């Protein structure tokens, strides 16, 4: 089995010099979300941390789409990773682990597709803010102390989004449904591959989670 991996790589946005600042700013904004919105006030502090650590990638992707972020990935050295002499079930599991941690050309194409679809919808700033809150409030997480509070907050955000669509886009009753259809793709993009692509050169030997911990304490 042969898998095309990018290995060590860096992101380029045409040499405009603003890429790192944007990525850092979006991560900082994501951390500040937990204190910004009153609807989140009923959620346990530890649960808010858990939610942020699991969803920061989704929040940044939505910032990318909102700001028409374009990028190219330039691998330092393309690598063909081969797993010979492994039985097929083990080989599939090994490849799956590789693909979730190491960026591949498939990952890059997948992310560009997701961002492109969101951009095509011409989502406004209010919608993006509410979508980020929905992504933050992941009701499927199992290690929450008070999942009911998260569910209630998520339902409130969903209602606010529905009301907003009714008032601002009355002629497009399917707009909300179309937006929500794109969220599983945002959620499903591998977080380790995303961190490797966009943040490894910024955080160095630490992790994005560690950076978020520091941001929450400041």
Task: Cite the ranges covered by each PLM segment.
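Nuclear receptor C-terminal ligand-binding domain
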Residues: 1-218
């Amino acid at each position: 089995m042969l898998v095309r991996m990018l290995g060590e790589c860096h992101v380029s946005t045409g040499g405009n010099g603003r890429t790192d600042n944007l990525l850092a700013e979006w991560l900082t904004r994501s951390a500040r979300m937990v204190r910004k919105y009153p609807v989140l006030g009923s959620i346990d502090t530890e649960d808010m941390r858990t939610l942020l650590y699991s969803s920061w990638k989704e929040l940044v992707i939505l910032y990318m789409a909102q700001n028409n972020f374009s990028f190219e990935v330039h691998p330092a050295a393309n690598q063909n990773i081969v797993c010979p002499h492994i039985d097929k079930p083990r080989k599939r599991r090994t490849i799956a682990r590789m693909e979730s941690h190491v960026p591949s050309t498939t990952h890059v194409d997948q992310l560009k597709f997701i961002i492109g679809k969101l951009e095509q919808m011409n989502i406004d700033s209010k919608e993006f803010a509410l979508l980020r809150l929905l992504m933050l409030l992941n009701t499927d997480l199992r290690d929450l102390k008070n999942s009911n509070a998260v569910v209630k907050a998520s339902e409130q955000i969903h209602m606010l989004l529905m009301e907003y669509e009714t008032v601002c886009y009355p002629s497009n009753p399917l707009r909300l449904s179309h937006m929500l259809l794109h969220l599983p793709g945002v959620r499903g993009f591998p977080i380790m591959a995303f961190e490797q692509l966009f943040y490894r050169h910024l955080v160095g030997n630490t992790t994005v989670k560690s950076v978020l911990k520091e941001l929450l304490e400041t």
